[in-house]
C-alpha cells in the first residue's frame, strides 16, 4: 500500500514529508487555527459548519485564507479520494484542516516567497478513536484538574486555535488520577463554573432539559451545536444555556461529553463519584440515549457500536489520555 498524501500549501506530498517549517508562525507562537471533521459512511459530517468556523477563526486572527469555501470543500473531498485505499469499507476518515499566516517575514530570505500555510490531512478515524470504545460501556469519569479554563477576556475561546497548552496541562494532571483508562478532564473557569473538556464540550441533563454552559467562555463545538440546533428540535427537548458549577453536575440527572470523534459520550461520574445511582449499570440515561439514537438515525450509522467495534479490534486497554500523552 502506498503512502498517504497530504495537501500542503498548494502541493500534494507524502505524509512523511509533510512537516511544519521551523520558521512558521505556528512554531513560534502557536499562531494557527484548525478544524477536525469526521465522516459517516465516508461522507463528511457537517463539513460546511466546520469550514464556516475556520473562516471565522481566520478573520478574528487576521490569518489569510486564499481559497473559497467551495474550493476547500473540493480539496477535502479530493484528499479523501487520493487516499481511498487507506479507507476500506467500514473505515471512516478523520480530516484535519490547518491554516496559519505562514513563515515569519523576518525569515523571508530563506524562502522563494512567503505564503500562508494551508494543510489538509485524511487519517483513518479508527486509529484515532480506538481508545474510546470502552467509554460507551463504562461511562466517563469527569475529573477536574487544577488547571483552569483560560477566560475569554485573556484569549478568545471561540477561536479554534492550535494553542492547546492549557488543555495539555489539564490532560497531564488528570492522567495521574488513579487509572487514565476511563477519565476525561473537565475544566472549570476562574469563577468555578463548568467550561468544557480538553477536546469536547460538556452537557448535562436536568429535569428533562439539555443544559450547556454559557457560550461566552468556551469553544462553540460543532457537535454541541448539532445537538442544540438539530437534534434537540427534532426530539422536542428544551435547551438552556446557563452558568453551572460542580454542585449542579453532582446533582444533575445525566451528563455527557460531545465532540467530533466521540459524537456523544456518556459521563456518569465526577471525580470518581457517580452522579446518579441509576447510571452505575448503564451510563446512558434516557435523554442521552434518545439523543444518541437520533444522531445515529440521522447519519445512517450506529456510531456507538462502531466505536465499540473499533475498540474490540485493538485488543488493548490503553486509555484516551495515553493516546495523547504517551508514557509519562
Show where each model-derived region lies:
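Helix-start/capping segments and mature chain N-termini
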Residues: 1-67, 71-78, 82, 106-328
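Short, internal active-site loops enriched in acidic
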Residues: 100-105
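Short, flexible active-site-proximal loops enriched in glycine and acidic residues
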Residues: 48, 85-92
Amino acid at each position: 500500500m502506498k503512502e498517504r498524501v497530504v495537501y500542503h500549501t498548494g502541493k500534494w506530498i507524502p505524509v512523511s514529508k509533510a512537516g511544519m517549517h521551523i520558521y512558521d508562525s505556528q512554531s513560534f507562537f502557536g499562531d494557527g487555527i484548525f478544524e477536525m471533521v469526521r465522516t459517516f459512511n465516508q461522507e463528511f459530517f457537517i463539513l460546511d459548519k466546520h469550514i464556516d468556523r475556520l473562516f471565522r477563526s481566520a478573520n478574528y486572527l487576521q490569518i489569510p485564507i486564499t481559497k473559497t469555501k467551495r474550493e476547500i470543500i473540493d480539496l477535502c473531498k479530493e484528499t479523501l479520494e487520493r487516499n481511498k485505499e487507506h479507507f476500506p469499507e467500514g473505515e471512516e476518515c478523520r480530516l484535519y484542516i490547518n491554516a496559519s499566516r505562514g513563515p515569519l517575514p523576518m525569515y523571508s530570505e530563506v524562502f522563494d516567497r512567503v505564503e500562508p500555510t494551508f494543510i489538509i490531512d485524511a487519517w483513518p478515524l479508527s486509529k484515532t478513536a480506538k481508545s474510546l470504545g470502552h467509554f460507551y460501556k463504562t461511562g466517563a469519569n469527569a475529573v477536574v484538574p487544577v488547571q483552569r479554563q483560560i477566560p475569554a477576556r485573556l484569549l478568545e475561546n471561540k477561536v479554534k486555535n492550535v494553542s492547546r497548552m492549557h488543555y495539555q496541562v489539564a490532560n497531564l494532571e488528570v492522567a495521574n488520577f488513579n487509572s487514565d483508562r476511563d477519565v476525561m478532564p473537565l475544566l472549570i473557569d476562574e469563577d468555578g463554573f463548568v467550561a468544557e473538556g480538553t477536546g469536547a464540550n460538556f452537557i448535562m441533563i436536568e429535569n428533562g432539559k439539555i443544559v450547556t454552559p454559557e457560550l461566552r467562555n468556551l469553544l462553540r463545538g460543532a457537535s454541541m451545536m448539532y445537538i442544540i440546533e438539530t437534534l434537540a428540535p427534532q426530539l422536542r427537548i428544551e435547551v438552556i444555556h446557563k452558568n453551572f458549577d460542580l454542585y449542579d453536575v453532582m446533582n444533575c440527572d445525566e451528563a455527557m461529553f460531545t465532540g467530533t470523534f466521540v459524537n456523544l459520550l456518556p459521563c456518569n461520574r465526577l471525580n470518581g463519584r457517580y452522579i446518579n445511582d441509576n447510571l452505575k449499570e448503564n451510563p446512558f440515561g434516557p435523554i442521552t440515549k434518545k439523543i444518541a439514537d437520533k444522531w445515529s438515525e440521522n447519519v445512517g450509522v450506529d456510531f456507538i457500536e462502531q466505536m465499540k467495534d473499533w475498540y474490540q479490534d485493538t485488543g488493548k486497554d490503553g486509555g484516551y489520555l495515553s493516546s495523547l500523552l504517551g508514557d509519562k
